[in-house]
Amino acid sequence: MGLMQKFDEPNIITTSTDKLFNWARKNSLWPLQFGLACCAIEMMSTGMAHNDLERFGAGFFAGSPRQADVMIVSGTVSTKMAERMTRLYEQMPEPKWVIAMGACAISGGPFLDGYSVLMGADRVIPVDVYVPGCPPRPEALIFGIMTLQKKIEREQQVGYEKPRPALVDEEGNIREYLPEREYRQISEGKAHRPKGIKRLPRTYVFQRKGLPPGSMTDVGWIPPEARERLKAGRGAGASGSGEREEGKEGA
């Protein structure tokens, strides 16, 4: 039985503009891929034929933020990529929604103690649906899209624009969704660690074997001043050992 056959007068269907527009929007989502780490592989797998994302009306991934209405953030959000993510979000037309896919996009995941990792995408842009997992399977992302469709179905936004605070100032920097202290750390490029994470001393650097001074280590990036101290310490150690060897030969 078709939809029109359920009514006595098949030529007329009474509904509200909200329901009509929401029905069209939820069944014609244009996702914008914002893959940052390993969760992006599962996001790409969701668009493959064996998952058939098109049956939910969201199978066409937009190539431009100006043609998209759903941003899927999958992966670790660093302070460097936070600026790019916010600019892409600002370029998306209203109405727009955001899906945070994976533990890293939700709360930082296993990398939340990194110096440049934000505790989730919702620190800089508003998130509508969270899809947990490390990484979540394609079925989980599909369920997240279905959850977003249910949310869109209940929205009322015809005739007005949903209020969204400005996320970027005149210079293109993140403002609204970050505390002043955290924004200052990001803008100055300083190390950022969430509350409760003990900050490692900047003077002590654990160097991996086989890597030159100044490269990535087990604890992260080496600050320039610590890098110089590390080089100076190694040079002093080498000269000291040479003096000791000369002393032994003289004895």
Curated annotation (Swiss-Prot):
InterPro entries, A to Z: NADH_UbQ_OxRdtase-like_20kDa, NADH_UQ_OxRdtase_20Kd_su
One term of GO molecular function: iron ion binding
Any Pfam family the entry gives: Oxidored_q6
Sequence segments annotated as region (Disordered): 208-251
GO biological processes: aerobic respiration; electron transport coupled proton transport
Compartment(s) where it occurs, according to its Swiss-Prot or TrEMBL record: Cell membrane
Bound cofactor: record note: Binds 1 [4Fe-4S] cluster.
Membrane-topology annotation of the record: Peripheral membrane protein
Signal sequence residues: none
CC per GO annotation: plasma membrane; respiratory chain complex I
Catalytic reaction list: a quinone + NADH + 5 H(+)(in) = a quinol + NAD(+) + 4 H(+)(out)
Chief location bin: membrane
Top EC class for this record: translocase
Cofactor(s) the record lists: [4Fe-4S] cluster
Disulphide linkage map: none
Keyword NAD attributed: yes
EC number(s) recorded for this UniProt protein: 7.1.1.-
Keywords: 4Fe-4S, Cell membrane, Iron, Iron-sulfur, Membrane, Metal-binding, NAD, Quinone, Translocase, Transport
Functional description taken from the UniProt entry: NDH-1 shuttles electrons from NADH, via FMN and iron-sulfur (Fe-S) centers, to quinones in the respiratory chain. The immediate electron acceptor for the enzyme in this species is believed to be a menaquinone. Couples the redox reaction to proton translocation (for every two electrons transferred, four hydrogen ions are translocated across the cytoplasmic membrane), and thus conserves the redox energy in a proton gradient.
Subunit-level organization: NDH-1 is composed of 14 different subunits. Subunits NuoB, C, D, E, F, and G constitute the peripheral sector of the complex.
Classification via NCBIfam families: nuoB_fam (TIGR01957), PRK06411.1 (NF005012)
Family: Belongs to the complex I 20 kDa subunit family.
Protein name: NADH-quinone oxidoreductase subunit B
Protein species of origin: Rubrobacter xylanophilus (strain DSM 9941 / JCM 11954 / NBRC 16129 / PRD-1)
